[in-house]
């Protein structure tokens, strides 16, 4: 008998022996005897069962890996160092994190010099051959835009449950870490299948379209302390917002939660915690029957510096079975998260949460997508699970657990549909009144913000009457809405207009603001002047700028017509450099402001208005909102004229002249721009940050460092556009490290790019550029036949007439007509 036949025979014998032993344990021994055997000798039992599954593992190895493969190379001495340290420190939740050097190879073979450690507090993460890892990448060489990743065994996250939970989170509009499944090799040996997620970082925030100048909190270690009683129980993953050093935002949230008055709590909680996000976060947990984001762990709170509020981010949601009767338990446990409990104890808040829950449950396609995703994930990953021989469970256990968790997810949906879709849900339960006030050793004193980051917080919820008592230069109409003007009005200090009203600024009003004084409104502003009686915002100081005119989270659209904004008496000199930032107002309720006019989480319409001499980063800044700008002029601003982040809108018949930096700087934004003139910009005519879509029609860019900059994965369509006098006409490049390369796309049609001092167009390998029926002076390799290399002549460029004097290639190239914009 050959050696090969002997090995095959031995393998078959081992399988038969293991199978016989399994059958003996399962069918011969009664349950009271069988269970202790399995529990006490789980490792042996699993090993025997795994022997019977050798054919499945061998079959899986014949197939390509269905997931990315990572390779980690670590010196055995360093691995022993980690083993010894974690074994000695097991159970010590306050242990230091130690890292050792290693080399990481991505699926494409790229090498990264990294630092690694074991991840996790319990011994299950480092006592067995399949360990959990945290891998930290160098700042100058991020991995897929990530600073750090964690690899844990999938059983720790209920196999496919957490991936499904994060899939749901994205459908609900919640931020979430990027996750996935990977196969790991350590020092050339298989380490098995892992669940990967990125670590909490600025990069994670940016990937979720959240500003990195906020704060990101999580619990400090894994203890038994109530997170919602002290700021000392929280750590900061990101600490960039005003007051971060003393956790002023968190102190305010905890103080409001623990205030004895329900009226005070209900009035103020939505001004420090974004309740719309809270409802989505809570519904997300309910769908999994989860109580895992409780008072002691798994809390992730992001303070949004554009909104001045916290937002929950789901984390380690887990799964639970909603099988208790609705009358005795309901879906809102009374003892797991005090902030959840107190919010939902207020009937109007509870009804809003229930409305969102019903919307999700009533959408059959949305519900079906959850299970379709779960099932497809199982089918994709099953071969990788079968291949993994280091896992501490059998293939049968994996299949049964996946089926069991799916059944729980299904029962939870059915339970919620029965009680919250087909029946009237129960009313809110009363909050536990003794919790906020009593401590074993005496009266509880909640934390108090110690700095000035939230000086104006209680102004947000003022009534119009309370506001007028503090600001008698305003008035109120019979509808309860506020008015300012006409005539001259002086604001010597920052004034905050409360929510739930509207501010009307009358035609013919001159608002003089003292140095660094701001007007911040949590309600829509209606400022409609006329050509004869404009509204003007002017500096009171002859040398210093005023602060900002800001609109924050207003539910209705604000309108500005025939409004003149002058930030300083003369243009700030010198202009800001492209990488320099200048704060002109704040902190105001945890927010800083760099725009002369700032619109956040709101809609604005601007017509026939002028923005001049802005001293900060932007003349007009729109973040997480919408804009419609027509017939307006931006001139002599120190940095960017218009800046939009994660917004959408239109710009029509508008001029941007003599900007220190960019004419238009848009990031994560979708914009339609037509009949616009951008002249003499210090940096870019149009700057397109990541994930931006620009449609530019019949517009002119004259004299800029870069005419149109298209970064990362953005796209631009230029039709009947003109770019002259730039160092580079169109520049496509990689800018943001969270994107692996520049994959931008640009289409240029019926346009003219000429008089570039360095190069006409710069395009990297991974980007795409299509051109037709255009004049490209100097030409461009690979262009279509109707792309002409000539030097164009204009009718009167000095006077702003950029129409072609002659039309090589036909009348359809260049401007269709002369844009009529303010001079």
What is each PLM-predicted segment?
Residues 2-111, 365-469:
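Regulatory N- and C-terminal appendages and interdomain linkers associated
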Residues 98-155, 561:
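Conserved oxyanion/phosphate-binding beta-strand-loop segments in alpha/beta enzyme cores
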Residues 128-163, 251-275:
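Short, conserved helix/loop micro-motifs enriched in His/Cys and acidic residues
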Residues 148, 174-185, 265-269, 299, ...:
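Surface-exposed patches in mature extracellular/periplasmic domains of secreted proteins
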Residues 154-187:
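A conserved helix-loop-beta module that forms one wall/lid of the active-site cleft
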Residues 174-177, 189-282, 378:
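Internal "kinase-insert"/substrate-recognition segments embedded within catalytic cores
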Residues 255-294, 301, 308-453:
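Middle-to-C-terminal accessory/interaction subdomains
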Residues 442-507, 512-823:
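Extracellular beta-rich repeat passengers
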């Amino acid at each position: 008998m050959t050696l090969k036949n002997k090995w095959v025979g031995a393998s078959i014998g081992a399988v038969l022996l293991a199978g016989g032993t399994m059958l003996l344990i399962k069918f011969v021994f009664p349950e009271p005897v069988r269970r202790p055997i399995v529990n006490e000798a789980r490792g042996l039992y699993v090993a025997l069962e795994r022997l019977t599954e050798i054919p499945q593992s061998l079959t899986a190895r014949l197939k390509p890996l269905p997931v990315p493969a990572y390779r980690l190379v670590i010196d055995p001495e360093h691995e022993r160092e980690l083993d010894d340290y974690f074994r000695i420190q097991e159970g010590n939740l306050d242990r230091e994190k130690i890292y050792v050097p290693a080399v990481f190879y991505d699926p494409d073979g790229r090498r990264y010099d990294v630092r690694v450690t074991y991840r996790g507090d319990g011994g299950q993460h480092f006592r067995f051959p399949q360990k959990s890892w945290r891998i930290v990448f160098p700042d100058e060489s991020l991995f897929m835009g990530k600073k750090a990743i964690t690899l844990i065994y999938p059983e720790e996250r209920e196999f496919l449950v957490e991936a499904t939970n994060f899939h749901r989170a994205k459908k609900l509009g919640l931020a979430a870490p990027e996750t996935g499944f990977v196969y790991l090799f350590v020092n050339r040996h298989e380490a098995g299948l892992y669940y990967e997620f990125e670590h909490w970082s600025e990069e994670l925030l940016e990937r979720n379209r959240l500003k990195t100048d906020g704060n990101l909190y999580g619990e400090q270690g894994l203890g038994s302390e109530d997170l919602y009683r002290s700021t000392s129980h929280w750590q900061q993953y990101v600490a960039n917002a005003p007051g971060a050093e003393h956790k002023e935002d968190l102190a305010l949230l905890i103080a409001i939660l623990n205030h004895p008055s329900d009226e005070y709590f209900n009035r103020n909680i939505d001004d420090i915690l974004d309740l719309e996000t809270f409802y989505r976060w809570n519904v997300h947990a309910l769908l999994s029957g989860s109580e895992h984001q409780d008072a002691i762990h798994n809390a992730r709170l992001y303070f949004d510096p554009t909104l001045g509020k916290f937002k929950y981010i789901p984390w380690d949601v887990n799964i639970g079975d909603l099988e208790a009767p609705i009358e005795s338990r309901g879906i809102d446990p009374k003892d797991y998260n005090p902030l959840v409990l107190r919010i939902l104890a207020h009937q109007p808040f509870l009804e809003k949460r229930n409305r969102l829950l019903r919307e999700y449950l009533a959408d059959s396609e949305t519900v079906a997508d959850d299970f379709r995703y779960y099932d497809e994930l199982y089918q994709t990953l099953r071969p990788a699970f079968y291949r993994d021989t280091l896992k501490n469970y059998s293939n049968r256990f994996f299949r049964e657990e996946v089926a069991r968790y799916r059944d729980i997810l299904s029962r939870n949906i059915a339970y919620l549909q029965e009680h919250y879709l087909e029946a009237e849900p129960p009313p809110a339960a009363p909050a536990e009144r003794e919790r906020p006030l009593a401590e074993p050793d005496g009266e509880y004193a909640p934390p108090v913000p110690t700095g000035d980051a939230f000086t104006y917080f209680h102004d947000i919820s003022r009534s119009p009457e309370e506001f007028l008592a503090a600001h008698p230069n305003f008035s109120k109409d019979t509808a309860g809405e506020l008015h300012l003007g006409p005539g001259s009005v002086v604001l010597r200090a920052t004034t905050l207009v409360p929510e739930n009203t509207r501010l009307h600024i009358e035609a013919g009003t001159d608002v003089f603001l003292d140095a660094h004084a701001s007007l911040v409104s949590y309600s829509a502003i209606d400022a409609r002047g006329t050509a004869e009686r404009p509204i003007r915002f002017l500096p009171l100081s002859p040398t210093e700028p005023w602060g900002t005119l800001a609109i924050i989270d207003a539910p209705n659209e604000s309108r500005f017509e025939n409004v003149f904004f002058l930030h300083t008496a003369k243009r700030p000199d010198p202009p800001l450099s492209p990488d320099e930032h200048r704060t002109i107002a704040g902190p105001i309720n945890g927010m800083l402001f760099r725009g002369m006019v700032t619109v956040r989480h709101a809609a604005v319409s601007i017509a026939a208005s002028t923005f001049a001499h802005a001293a900060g980063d932007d003349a007009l800044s729109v973040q997480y909102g919408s804009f419609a700008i027509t017939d307006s002029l931006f001139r002599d601003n120190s940095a960017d004229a218009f800046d939009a982040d994660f917004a959408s809108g239109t710009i029509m018949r508008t001029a941007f002249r003599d900007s220190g930096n960019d004419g238009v700087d848009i990031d994560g934004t979708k914009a339609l721009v037509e009949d616009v003139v951008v002249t003499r910009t210090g940096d870019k005519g149009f700057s397109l940050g990541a994930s931006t879509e620009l449609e530019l029609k019949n517009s002119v860019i004259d004299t800029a460092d870069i005419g149109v900059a298209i970064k990362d994965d953005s796209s631009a369509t230029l039709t009947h556009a003109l770019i002259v006098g730039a160092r580079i006409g169109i520049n496509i490049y990689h800018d943001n490290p969270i994107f692996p390369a520049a994959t931008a796309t640009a289409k240029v049609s019926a346009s003219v790019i000429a008089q570039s001092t360095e190069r006409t167009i710069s395009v990297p390998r991974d980007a795409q550029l299509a051109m037709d029926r255009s004049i490209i002076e100097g030409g461009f390799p690979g262009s279509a036949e109707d792309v002409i290399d000539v030097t164009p002549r204009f009718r009167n460029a000095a006077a702003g007439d950029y129409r072609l004097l002659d039309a090589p290639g036909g009348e359809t190239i260049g401007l269709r007509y002369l844009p009529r914009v303010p001079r």
